[in-house]
């Protein structure tokens, strides 16, 4: 029997591109784990993807995962676009290279390790897990910019 895990993810960027951060809150059997990180020059979409990738990478064995995001980009990529990108060799319908293909490929690899269901929530509406992930993403931005949080 595999563990059931909820992962709440968020990305943040100060400028787009600019310094960015990602955050993931993992919850399993009432135990929480916080993850965050950042990059000096990135985009909000890359940080949204990184949050999901890092959250899934943290799981050491196959799990039933509910991944909760406020990113329409991540949701549409996973549910609508990725299958066709893969069929076309990571090209769009216009035969252009898929933006962030490196991260989409990493996410695809991680998703295939688990049984993942995806849930979209509207950001900044008081959803506890989403708000925590947002705080973690902003911590990632702050650390990249040289601000340390207590």
Swiss-Prot record:
GO MF assignments: magnesium ion binding; nucleic acid binding; RNA-DNA hybrid ribonuclease activity
Subcellular location: Cytoplasm
EC class (word): hydrolase
Binding site for Mg(2+) 2: 10, 134
Gene designation: rnhA
Record protein name field: Ribonuclease H
Any one cellular-component term (Gene Ontology): cytoplasm
Enzymatic reactions: Endonucleolytic cleavage to 5'-phosphomonoester
Alphabetized Pfam families for the sequence: RNase_H
């Amino acid at each position: 029997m595999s563990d059931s895990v909820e992962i709440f993810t968020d990305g943040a960027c100060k400028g787009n591109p600019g310094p960015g951060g990602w955050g993931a809150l993992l919850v399993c059997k009432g135990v929480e784990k916080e993850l965050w990180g950042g990059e000096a020059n990135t985009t909000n979409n890359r940080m949204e993807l990184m949050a999901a990738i890092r959250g899934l990478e943290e799981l050491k064995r196959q799990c039933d995962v509910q991944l909760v995001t406020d990113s329409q980009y991540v949701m549409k990529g996973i549910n609508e676009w990725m299958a066709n990108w893969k069929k076309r060799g990571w090209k769009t319908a216009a035969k252009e290279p898929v933006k962030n293909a490196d991260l989409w490929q990493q996410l695809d690899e991680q998703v295939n390790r688990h049984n993942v269901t995806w849930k979209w929530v509207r950001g900044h509406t008081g959803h506890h897990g989403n708000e925590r992930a947002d705080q973690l993403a902003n911590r990632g931005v702050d650390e990249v910019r040289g601000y340390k949080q207590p």
